[in-house]
A protein has these predicted regions:
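N-terminal auxiliary segments of SAM/dcSAM-dependent transferases
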Residues: 1-26
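Class I SAM-dependent methyltransferase Rossmann-like catalytic core
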Residues: 20-64
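Conserved class I S-adenosyl-L-methionine
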Residues: 69-79
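Conserved SAM-binding loop of SAM-dependent methyltransferases across substrates and taxa
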Residues: 80-92
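A short SAM/SAH-binding and catalytic strip from SAM-dependent methyltransferases
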Residues: 141-163
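A short glycine-rich, Lys/Arg-flanked "PGG" loop and its adjoining helix->strand segment in the class I
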Residues: 160-172
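Conserved beta-strand signature within the Rossmann-like core of class I S-adenosyl-L-methionine
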Residues: 169-183
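Substrate-binding/catalytic lobe of Class I Rossmann-like enzymes that use SAM or dcSAM, i.e.
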Residues: 190-270, 274, 278-284
Length: 306
């Protein structure tokens, strides 16, 4: 989509004009990037998706009795619909997937509709970090979902802004399920973000391909390498693509230079404790109703209420 491309160009210019360069993680998820991420979720080292799905199966048994009236499901950064499929039931009248990659949510929505033909699906292209005006026709009770530990992918405290805007989007008497990865052994974390199949590397290096396709930067993927490591003081996995040599490129006539070994941050994945997540939710105007986790306390899904 034209607007999607313009937003991408604007963000690249803004962030590459800084001494510490970064690409916001939401731009990973064009059609090709979203499919690369699906590959990551199948990697043996990447535990997040497997554990979260097990937890969602537990939640699915409770959701029917917890919410007795007809509901609308609103998923922020929906991407693939395999997780929401676990939770859908006859009381869900509307499903509104919100994502910055319209091509991918449109494709996913068609697949979901084949399995749930009576469900009214309204795929919505948007920057879900901001307030979104939902259709008036959907049900009063709105249940939001922000899964996959995406809450950890924000820079500079933006997760609080997201949660506040999600509350405005969903409105009064709403609920939000949030998946959060928990602090654990360094070795487990670093293996998850450096899988042996190389899926995480391809996922991150795909940003170079996207820059070439959408901005005509004429960069070569082989001139970059991928690294990801744990920043212990910040309890955060940080991923970068690193320029192997000095490179230059132009955007709208403006020259940009990458030094040899210069790092471009492409992902931040904050890890939480139960108390740090509850503190975040409270400071954003949400109340933690309850949470579910696996037996090893690797991962948790929190139910928030407005």
């Amino acid at each position: 989509m034209k607007n999607e491309r313009q937003i991408f160009i604007k963000e690249i210019i803004k962030n590459f004009s800084k001494s510490k360069k970064k690409i916001p993680s939401k731009f990973h998820y064009d059609l090709k990037g979203s499919k690369y991420f699906e590959k990551i979720t199948t990697a043996k080292e990447y535990y997040i998706t497997r554990i979260e799905k097990k937890i969602l199966k537990k939640i699915a048994k409770k959701i029917n009795t917890t919410f007795k009236d007809f509901t609308s499901f609103v998923e922020f950064g929906s991407g693939s619909t395999d997780k929401i499929s676990i939770l859908l039931n006859k009381k869900v009248k509307y499903y509104i997937p919100l994502d910055i990659s319209f091509d991918f949510i449109r494709e996913s929505s068609k697949k979901l509709h084949r399995n749930f033909p009576n469900l009214k699906i309204i795929p919505t292209y948007c920057d879900y970090n901001k307030f979104i005006s939902l259709p008036n026709k959907i049900t009063k009770i709105k249940i939001g979902f922000f899964l996959g530990s995406s809450i950890g992918n924000f820079y500079n405290g933006e997760e609080k802004i997201f949660l506040k805007n999600a509350k405005k989007t969903l409105g009064k008497n709403s609920y939000l399920f949030v998946g959060a990865d928990l602090i654990k052994n360094k070795n487990i974390l670093e293996k998850a973000y450096n899988d042996s199949g190389g899926f995480a590397a391809r996922f991150n290096l795909n940003l170079v391909r996207r820059m070439n396709n959408e901005i005509n930067t004429k960069l070569k993927i082989n001139d970059f390498k991928y690294i990801s490591k744990l920043n212990m003081p910040k309890s955060t996995m940080q991923s970068f693509i690193v320029s192997k040599k000095k490179q230059k490129f132009f955007i709208n006539g403006k020259k940009f230079v990458l030094k040899k070994n210069e790092k471009i941050q492409t992902e931040t994945s904050k890890k939480f404790t139960f108390s740090s997540f509850k503190k975040l939710a409270k400071s954003s105007g949400w109340k933690v109703n309850r949470f579910w986790c696996d037996e090893k306390n690797y991962y948790a899904v929190f139910l928030l209420s407005s």
